[in-house]
């Protein structure tokens, strides 16, 4: 899509929506041709639990406004801005020329701690390499909308969505493994063919690579599987940029002691991953007993999962122990 920059359109910088009166960015020249769009941008509703994936760290909202001009999009450069997400919401008021079609792009992430490169002017986000594993700062949300602006006030609600699959790994034999002399303190994962580029206006994920997270301290929250008589210790939690269609991939999981010198690695094939879905791999993963469960559930809402995939257990019986000097 060809894009040109529309410069000098705004007479003043945009103010975020507060209780005080807003200035008119364009003076009074437009008169009745002026419209105001009042946007309420929100994260999806999520329950309050100790599980990861509640979006609490996504406190910075970046957004850009584009004016449609035939097959072109004209960036309204002075309307590119940021807002603070409070309690999962941000309110924005923007005054624009009426009777014109606009597109908005949104991205919400962890302010100052985000592992993503955001080019909001070109509505593109890239996943940086070597992201630390098991960090909730890796969670983020995106959204877009089209507005045919009319004269007067145009209220709109926009709900952002997560472009990632959340991959969780948990084990029921954490303590017995520790008692045997291997105290797991850090983990990492490598995934074949995860995506690294997101178009905020289309939602398209591209540039797939074999992606590997670096070692990170194991998660501390509750493992997101309910209704089980067995308690699982969280070993790994990571966000992977995926498409809206379910894909299967190979996941290589490595756990290490505090020094990182004693490691154990295992691979799982045919693991299902899908945007905005949670995939759980759990069982007695560290001992000789072989019990593996894999579930995938939509929108992070169903803690029990809706799609069991027992074939994974049959495909993954090799367990490699490595001791590095």
Predicted regions and their residues:
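Bacterial N-terminal signal peptides that target proteins for export
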Residues: 1-7
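Extracytoplasmic cysteine-anchoring/structural motifs
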Residues: 20-325
């Amino acid at each position: 899509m060809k894009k040109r920059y529309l410069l000098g359109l705004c007479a003043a910088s945009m103010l975020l929506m507060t209780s005080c009166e807003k200035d008119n960015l364009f003076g009074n020249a437009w008169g009745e041709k002026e419209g105001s769009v009042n946007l309420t941008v929100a994260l999806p509703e999520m329950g309050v639990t100790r599980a990861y994936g509640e979006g609490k760290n996504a406190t910075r909202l970046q957004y850009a406004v584009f004016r449609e001009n035939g097959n072109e999009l004209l960036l309204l450069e002075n309307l590119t801005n940021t807002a603070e997400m409070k309690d999962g919401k941000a309110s924005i008021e923007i005054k624009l020329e009426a009777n014109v079609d606009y597109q908005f792009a949104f991205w919400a992430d962890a302010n100052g701690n985000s592992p993503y490169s955001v080019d909001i002017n070109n509505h593109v986000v890239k996943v940086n390499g070597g992201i630390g594993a098991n960090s909730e700062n890796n969670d983020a949300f995106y959204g877009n909308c089209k507005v045919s602006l009319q004269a007067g006030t145009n209220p709109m609600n926009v709900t952002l969505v997560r472009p990632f699959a959340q991959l969780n790994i948990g084990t029921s034999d954490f303590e017995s493994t520790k008692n045997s002399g291997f105290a797991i303190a850090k983990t990492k994962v490598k995934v074949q063919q995860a995506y690294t580029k997101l178009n905020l206006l289309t939602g398209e994920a591209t540039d797939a690579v074999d992606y590997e997270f670096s070692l990170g301290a194991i998660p501390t929250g509750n493992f997101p599987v309910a209704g089980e008589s067995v308690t699982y210790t969280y070993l790994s939690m990571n966000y992977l940029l995926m498409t809206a269609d379910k894909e299967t991939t190979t996941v290589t999981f490595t756990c290490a002691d505090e020094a990182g010198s004693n490691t154990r690695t295992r691979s799982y094939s045919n693991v299902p991953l899908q945007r905005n879905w949670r995939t759980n791999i759990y069982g007695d993963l560290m001992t000789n007993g072989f019990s593996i469960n894999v579930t995938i559930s939509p929108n992070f809402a169903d803690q029990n999962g809706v799609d069991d995939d027992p074939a994974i257990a049959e495909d993954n019986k090799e367990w490699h122990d490595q001791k590095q000097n």
